[in-house]
Amino acid sequence: MSPQTETKANVGFKAGVKDYKLTYYTPEYETLDTDILAAFRVSPQPGVPPEEAGAAVAAESSTGTWTTVWTDGLTSLDRYKGRCYHIEPVAGEENQYICYVAYPLDLFEEGSVTNMFTSIVGNVFGFKALRALRLEDLRIPVAYVKTFQGPPHGIQVERDKLNKYGRPLLGCTIKPKLGLSAKNYGRAVYEVLRGGLDFTKDDENVNSQPFMRWRDRFLFCAEALYKAQAETGEIKGHYLNATAGTCEDMMKRAVFARELGVPIVMHDYLTGGFTANTTLSHYCRDNGLLLHIHRAMHAVIDRQKNHGIHFRVLAKALRLSGGDHIHSGTVVGKLEGERDITLGFVDLLRDDYTEKDRSRGIYFSQSWVSTPGVLPVASGGIHVWHMPALTEIFGDDSVLQFGGGTLGHPWGNAPGAVANRVALEACVQARNEGRDLAREGNTIIREASKWSPELAAACEIWKEIKFEFPAMDTV
C-alpha cells in the first residue's frame, strides 16, 4: 500500500490531547535536499519548554492541530508533517530560541508563494503558547525554485535593453507624491530624465486618484520619456504603477503601458498580494516589460525583532514571485537598514548562490540555479553626499534613487538630476582608478563640484543633512 493511502486502522484510534513534541520534535531527523527549511525566532510563554514551542510551530504550520483526530489514520503523517529538528538559544536574549523546522515539499503547491506563506506564516503566528514568533529565514530547495518563473527578465537582460553598463542606474521618485495633475507630473518626469537620470518613478501611493487618473498619468509620462530620449540619446524609463484595486484593473494598466511602448511598469507587491504579483510578472516576461517592485507595508511585517517576517524572507519570496527591481533600504538614508544585514539580502537578490553566513543574518545556503537576479533599489532620504557610500555599498548592479535629493535642488528639477549624474560619474571614475570611496568619498564629491555648479549647489544645500539613529534590525 502506498504511503498516500496507508492507514493506521490496525493501531487503533486514541482520542485526546498530547504534547506536540511527542510527534513533531525530531532532533534525530536528517534534512533532505527537497525540504523547505525554516528558521523561526520563538519566544515561548512562561512555562512552555522550547521543545514544545518548536514542535508546536512545526505542527500548526503543517499537519497538526490541537487534539488528536480520527482522520490522522487515513494518511501518513510521517510523510507530510513538519519537523522541528534543531533548537538553539538566542545569545543575549532571555527565553528566546531559534527553532529550525523542515517541511516536506509535497505540502506546497508548485509555483505558489501564496500557498507557501499560507502554511509557513499562517495561523501559527497567533498561537497562544507563544509570546512572539518571527520567521528569520527560509531555505528554498532547488526542486521548488524551478517551479517558479522568477523575475521577468533579470539584471543582464535589463542592461541590454537599456544599453547601460559599468555603473549603477539612477532614478527619482516624483514628489510631491500626491496632488499633482497628470500634466505637471509629466513635466517633472521630463525635466529629471533630460537632466541625466535613467528612471523616474511613481510613488507607491499613486494609483488612480481623483486628482490624477492612471490613464492620463501614463500618457503624459510616456510623452515625457520619449521627449527626453530624443534629446539625450539615452534610453529612459518611468515606473508606471499598475497596482490597482482588482487584478483585472491591474492587468488593464499593464496592457496599456505595453501599448504605449514604455519599458517598465511597477507593482506594490505586498499590498497588492503575491498572486497578483506573480500574474503581472508572467505578463511582463511575455510582453517585454521590466517590472519594478515597491515593498510598501514591509516594515509592518519585518521591523519588530521578535515577531513577524524578516525582509530577507520577503526578498526571497519576491525573487520567486517575480520582479526586476525591489527596494532594499539604503544603509545611509532615512529608512531602516543595517549594513551587513542589508548586504546579506541584497546578495540573496542578485547572486546565483549564497553561502550560510550568520554574521549577515543568512541562516541557510541558498541556490537559485538559473533564476534571474533582481536589482536592489536604494531609495529614501539620500542625496549627493551619500553617493560615494552608495556606490561602494551596492556596486554597479543597483538602482540609486533620489526623490527629494533631485527635486529639492535649489535651482530646479533638471539641475538636481545633473548634480546626481555628475556625482555618480565622479564616484565610478574614482573607483575605477583605484581610489577608496569609503575614505575619500567627500573629497571626490568636492573635486567634482568644482567643475559642476549644479553639484556645488546640491552639496551646499544638503551638507548638514544626516539620519543617524540606531538600527532596529541587528543579528
From Swiss-Prot:
GO CC annotations on file: chloroplast
Main location: plastid
Catalyzed reactions: 2 (2R)-3-phosphoglycerate + 2 H(+) = D-ribulose 1,5-bisphosphate + CO2 + H2O; D-ribulose 1,5-bisphosphate + O2 = 2-phosphoglycolate + (2R)-3-phosphoglycerate + 2 H(+)
Biological processes per GO annotation: photorespiration; reductive pentose-phosphate cycle
Modified residues (N-acetylproline): 3
E.C. number: 4.1.1.39
Binding of substrate, residues: 123, 173, 177, 295, 327, 379
Localization (cell): Plastid, Chloroplast
Sequence positions that bind Mg(2+): 201, 203-204
Propeptide: 1-2
Keywords: Acetylation, Calvin cycle, Carbon dioxide fixation, Chloroplast, Disulfide bond, Lyase, Magnesium, Metal-binding, Methylation, Monooxygenase, Oxidoreductase, Photorespiration, Photosynthesis, Plastid
Cofactor(s) the record lists: Mg(2+)
Modified residues (N6,N6,N6-trimethyllysine): 14
Matches recorded under Pfam families: RuBisCO_large, RuBisCO_large_N
Quaternary data: Heterohexadecamer of 8 large chains and 8 small chains; disulfide-linked. The disulfide link is formed within the large subunit homodimers.
Record-linked PANTHER family: RIBULOSE BISPHOSPHATE CARBOXYLASE (PTHR42704), RIBULOSE BISPHOSPHATE CARBOXYLASE LARGE CHAIN (PTHR42704:SF15)
Protein name (record): Ribulose bisphosphate carboxylase large chain
Organism: Atriplex rosea
Name of encoding gene: rbcL
